[in-house]
Amino acid sequence: MPGVEDPCDSQGTPPEEPSTSVAPGEAAKEQSPRLCGYLAKLSGKGPLRSFKNRWFVLDPRKCQFYYFKHHQDAQPLGQIDIGDASFSYDLEAEEGQFEIHSAGRVSILRAPSRHAMTYWLQELQQKRWEYCNSFGALKRESVINPASTKVPIGLVARESPDYMGIPNINDAERARNQFAVETCPSVLGDQTSAEQASNNPAAVQVLLRQWSNDIRSSMQHLRPGKSSDCRKSTFYTNEEWELLNPTPKELEESLLHVEKRKPPTEGIKGSTGMSFPFDFGRIPQRARRPLREIMGVNKNRTECLADSLPVSDSRMESDVLLKLQSQEEELERLKKDLLSQKELVRLLQQSLRSSQYDKYFASPFCDGLSKEHLHLLQQKDTQIQELNHLLERQTLEKDHLHQEVEELKCSVKELKDQLNMMMETIQAKDEVIMRLSRQLSKYEQHTPSSTVAAEIPVAPQLEELNRLQDSLQGYKAQNTFLNKEILELSALRRNAERREREMEARYSNLEAKMCQIESKYLVLLQEMKTPVCSDDQGTAREFVNQLLEDALKVENAEQPEHTFVKPHTVSKYDIHGFLIVPEDDEEEEKLVAKVRALDLKTLSLTENQEISNVVKWDNYFASTVNREMACSPELKALVRNGIPHEHRSRMWKWFTNLHIKKLKDEAAPGYFQSLLQNALEKQNPASKQIELDLMRTLPNNKHYTSPTSEGIQKLRNVLLAYSWRNPDIGYCQGINRLAAIALLYLDQEDAFWCLVTIVEAFMPRDYYTKTLLGSQVDQRVFKDLMNEKLPRLCAHFEQYKVDYTLITFNWFLVVFVDSVVSDILFRIWDSLLYEGSKVIFRFALGLFKYKEEEILKLQDSMSIFKYLRYFSRTILDARKLCNIAFVDMNPFPLRQIRNRRTYHLEKVRLELSELEAIRADFIRERETNPERRDLISDDEEDS
């Protein structure tokens, strides 16, 4: 983790700056880098108060600032609410110290430097602004209105909150950014600085300004009189800077000029033992101008060069210089090759002449001459060759001397130019010295004679001036920060007032509606109290009909609404998209469904259990800020109490990865997409049945009501991909509902892996095959558990010969989908995905235990079976059901279920094999017996 250090003791020096890190585990891929780092916190009481290093982590979801003793700790020492906090700092206090005012308390913190303090304050202000001006700020009302909470993925995430959108706050944000303090990039963590540079245009400007300053500082040694190693003056002319993009001809001339100039210059330096401090070699021969003109141009250029030079131009110049250097090296190499080729040609010419002479002496013309003449001719030829060689050497030496003379002339000319410029420089410096001398003499004439006495108070005054300037800069920064803080707090206060007005309007609307209903009931009671004189009840019947009609009304989006918010009444769908009041049922059943929905909402509003559960989950996530989530009794208890709506998507994904991590790691990247592509491109025997069952999967859920619904498209993809993955199952009616429930909180790929987890990891083999062997075995196991846990109820069923497995078979196959209300359904799924299929037995027993007394009161098989078909939907208290399933049903060992599954598996296999043998005998007898064939109907023959 960048910038994280473990302090040696509580009084040690904290790390230099805050840092950003990514939350561990799988959630790290989804969450943005979080703000964390060491700060010194003032703690203790009375005179024992002291600063102690604490590891601070900001949770942006709740805008809570948690602090730990060390960054490895799991439990925080405390927390500071940043959402309702204000910030300040005092210049008179220690460097880096600032205060956070929140919930009536003042927390005093200290950063290692002023830059780090500025960065912390800016980040905390930004997080507070984002939290208070986003829909996440409405999560504080999510207990009353769960639908207003957004989840990251899944079909439920498409739900928009009931509150209207927050007004445009760009004006406040723009005014707020005017007071933003620029932070030095060195203070930022690696990831934070990279993010700010890519996401914030202002940060890009800061980086560009910093690069410009770096260029300016790197060019200081180029200015006259600024070098520390030698008094060297360097002048740059317009022509010199134009050489950055030279033409090829100018480049060649310049290189030749340098080639000619180097040898004599070195020779002169070596002979005279001195070197001139002026570097005029960079200036071309044609670029000579008077010194005063050059100095004037140079002065203007050095003043505006660093500020006007863009970063992009400097990059282009560096690229051009690199290309120029490579071309120079290439030119040097080609010149060397040319010289070697010339030398080779010369040697070849000499060898050619020698061979011609040898050939001449070997020719027939020399056959008639005597040996003395031949010897004399050979000597003459040798002398001629030597003379030719000598002539060539003399010619080369002459050319070389001529070249040296030309170079010496050029160097003499350059030295004269340098001497003239040096003389002009000396003259200019003499003029400056004379002018300064005259000014000094005038100053001495007008000042008292005792100059030493006048210089004594100058040093303290300068120190005081510097101190005042530093204080002025500090107060300016403090004033800027406080202006920004005041502006931001004002905007947040206006937003809070707006939300308060909306809540008041909403409550006024609900109160008015409550008064209307109450007045109608009072009138109805008054009418019912009066004696009835005839069979016609008159007004009372009208009031009853009116009340029933009002109760069955469902909120319509086209009805006029309040100006600010929608009245939060019972809507047509629940938070998960399930239809509350059936559309095709009779009026009496609609009324019962409406009453059930109102009872369920009353439970969620009146009980404090849901609120405490949300707080427990928030505390749990706060304890996992510095560590990965792991299986623990604490997490098990939380899951059994139910996962809050806003955390369910994250936890379901984590549960899936927990159970099939090995399978996912073995799968190739893009495994789901490749399966889906194969299923779509190739012939799939299960695709036809999948298409038939898509619209019948969850017809009472608005995400699956239309063929063009997003849920239908995703469900098709998941089922096709799984049918291609597992050919033994392919597609079985039942897994479509499992996938549909998973898609409500997960995306396509995660829902696919969730389906794999349930079918292949949780359920026994052959659970969804053609024989449904595993499902039949589980029904036998459930019968044994019923005899053990609920003997009275089991005896009651046996007395009236009621086979309750006809009802429970579907519970196990689709994990209670369409069998219980949605709130209980998702509580069951929470525990299922964490603990496995044992949970299904617990809840099935819990449902019967919940309604045991009501079932025992029924005294005939028809009424019992009719009651079993719908009784599970009448159970609304999820907390009571979970308490029965996880407390009253104990002990409930998994080993017992495994042993009973193994025992019944052999029995069911034996029965299935016997049935298969009977079926085979029947088919064989029907085929061989003509009399039996005559009994076959026409329809059977067609089939």
UniProtKB/Swiss-Prot annotation:
Residues 1-29 are annotated as: Disordered. Its main location: other. Residues 315-514 form a coiled coil. The keyword Transmembrane helix does not apply. Transmembrane segments: none annotated. Residues 642-836 form the Rab-GAP TBC domain. The keyword Coiled coil applies. Residues 10-22 have a biased composition (Polar residues). Keywords: Coiled coil, Endosome, GTPase activation. Residues 32-129 form the PH domain. InterPro entries: PH-like_dom_sf, PH_domain, Rab-GAP-TBC_dom, Rab-GAP_TBC_sf, Rab_GAP_TBC_domain. GO terms for molecular function: GTPase activator activity. It is found in: Early endosome. One of its GO terms (cellular component) is early endosome. It comes from the Eukaryota. PANTHER family: RAB GTPASE-ACTIVATING PROTEIN 1-LIKE, TBC1 DOMAIN FAMILY MEMBER 2B. GTPase-activating protein that plays a role in the early steps of endocytosis. This is TBC1 domain family member 2B. It comes from Xenopus tropicalis. The gene is tbc1d2b.
